[in-house]
Structure formats: C-alpha cells, structure tokens
A protein has these predicted regions:
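C-terminal catalytic "cap/lid" subdomain
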Residues: 2-62, 66-266
Length: 266
C-alpha cells in the first residue's frame, strides 16, 4: 500500500501524465491520497472578508492562525472545493475515488492546542490562545480500509476531530504520515514542487533516518515539515518515505523508482 500526499501548491500543477501514471500504479497496488491546499484557503478566506493571519514559531516555522471562523473556512475549502475537485478529476479519468475528511468516521482525531508560543514583529516570544489547531493523537483506519476494499481510492482532506467534536486544522504532511502508519503502508510519498531535500546546494538522493534527524536544524522551514513527517512515518513502521516533484513525467512511478528525489529509510 502507498500513501501519497499532494502538496497544496502542486494540486493545480501536476504533470499531465499523473493520472495515467496513477492508473498504472493502481493495477498493482492500493493507493490513498492525502491533499493540502492552504493557498486556496487564503484566497477564499480573503474573498469572504476574513483576513488570513499567519504566525511564526520560535523555530521560524510559519503557519496559519486558525480561529473559529477560519476553521470553518478551512473546512469548507479543504473538504469541499479542493477535495471534490480532486475526486472529480479522478472519476473523469476512470479512477473510482471517494473523498472524505479526517472528520468522517473519526478517521483523524487530534488534541486541540490550548496555547501557542509565537514570535511577534519585534522578535519577542509571546503565548497566545491555541485557536483551532490540532496535534494528531489517533488514527482510525476502518473507513479508509472499507473504501479500499470496495476498490475506491480514498482522497483525504487534513481536518481532524477534537476531543470536544470541533473541526481542527492539522498539518497535511503529518496527516499523511499518520495515515500511512495507521495503515502499515509500505511507502509514503510527498509530492511537492521541488525534487526533494537540498543540503549544501545538492539534492540528497538517499538519507538514513538518523542522518535525517541530525539534519533538521539545517533544513529550510517548508522542507523541514516534510522531513519531520517522513521521520514520523518511519517511527510508525512505514518502510520508506519519499519526497519528490510533481512536475515531472509519471511523478509517482518516478518516485517509486527513486529517480531524482529524496528517499529516507531507517
């Protein structure tokens, strides 16, 4: 089984061969898709008059601040517009697909973050309310497994259910990692807009789990999240984590053959 995470910035820019490539993969393996889409959330939120706010952690990681209204917009865009657009694309090309969110079937449960430590414009640390952002603490794979057994490709949006049954914004890369772990997947592939991890101006084609952990302080913040998700997936028993570009011919097969991408193993 393979779990594939499609980054939000790449959903509209996938290579034209992606669908035929996926159809060929499905002849021999089961696939689960997890998607992002933060850019669309920002655009639609602003159109609705809800300015999207971003915060920076002490480690320099930028993320969306999710208050209650933003959580509703996030849920609407992720599970409505983006998820169903991907499902429609798959169906129109002869791939049986079913779109769900992490809410459905309690697929992804998370603990709501009560407080967040952020850095303000003056570089000072502040503690603010955690809003509606979650840390994944449980994956229930029954619904996904039932869809797979029915020969559907599950397409999952990264929204989690809190302990108080609230919608929570969760990181899409980590959602893919946890789903891969929960399904005991053989591989998880993070399809993005770059070829993989760059260190010292060179593409890292293969790296061990231990070396990946050691390298985290030297990795740019966008890629750092993906490498952390790779590490977490390996911790949960996934055999191989791959970071690869979606803008190449047959991107999934290319990643599986380790062509011009980053492969992380224990």
């Amino acid at each position: 089984m393979i779990v594939i995470k499609i980054g939000g910035s790449i959903v509209d820019g996938l290579h034209s061969s992606t669908i035929s490539d996926l159809k060929n993969i499905l002849k021999q393996d089961k696939v689960v898709l997890v998607h992002g889409g933060g850019k669309d959330v920002t655009i639609i939120g602003n159109k609705l008059g809800k300015e999207q706010k971003f915060i920076v952690s002490p480690g320099g990681v930028k993320s969306r601040y999710t208050d209650k209204e933003t959580a509703e917009i996030y849920t609407m865009v992720m599970s409505g517009k983006i998820n169903k657009t991907i499902v429609r694309l798959l169906l129109s090309n002869g791939i049986s697909a079913a779109g769900i969110s992490g809410i459905d079937g309690s697929t992804i449960e998370a603990l709501r973050k009560k407080k967040l430590v952020v850095v303000n414009d003056k570089g000072r640390k502040m503690i603010i309310d955690g809003g509606y952002t979650g840390k994944i603490n449980k994956i229930n794979t029954l619904l996904i497994r039932n869809l797979i057994e029915g020969n559907f490709v599950p397409v999952v949006s990264p929204i989690a259910l809190s302990e108080e049954n609230e919608f929570l914004n969760i990181d899409g890369d980590r959602a893919a990692a946890y789903i891969a772990g929960g399904l005991s997947a053989d591989k998880v592939i993070f399809i993005t807009n770059v070829n993989g991890l760059i260190l010292n101006d060179e593409l890292v084609k293969e790296i061990t789990y231990d070396k990946a952990k050691e390298s985290l302080p030297n990795i740019g913040h966008g890629m750092e999240k993906k490498v952390m998700a790779c590490i977490e997936s390996l911790d949960m028993g996934v055999k191989e984590a791959i970071i690869a570009s979606g803008d190449v011919e047959n991107p999934v097969s290319s990643a599986l053959f380790h062509t011009n991408c980053t492969v992380i193993r224990k």
